Amino acid sequence: MKNSIKVERAIHSLTQEQLAQKLGVSRQTIHTIEANKYVPSTVLALKLAQLFNKQVGEIFRLDEED
């Protein structure tokens, strides 16, 4: 699964730490999601979409391998 969190974060001028604080997670969680090493829970994916005013499918997309 690929995501555009890093791009959205840059658009909103947020650091990983700032985004993590807004979502109530660690900076490491944001880092691993951005690196496509961790797939977030449904709740966290929805929170990200809401924060960035996007649909979940606009932020997360399936890879051919998925």
What is the predicted role of each segment?
Residues 25-38:
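Recognition helix of helix-turn-helix/homeodomain-like DNA-binding domains
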Residues 43-58:
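DNA major-groove recognition helix of helix-turn-helix/homeodomain DNA-binding modules
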Residues 3-22:
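Short basic helix-loop element that most often maps to the first helix and adjoining turn
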Residues 60-66:
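Short, charged recognition helix plus adjacent turn
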Residues 18, 29, 58:
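Residues in the helix-turn-helix
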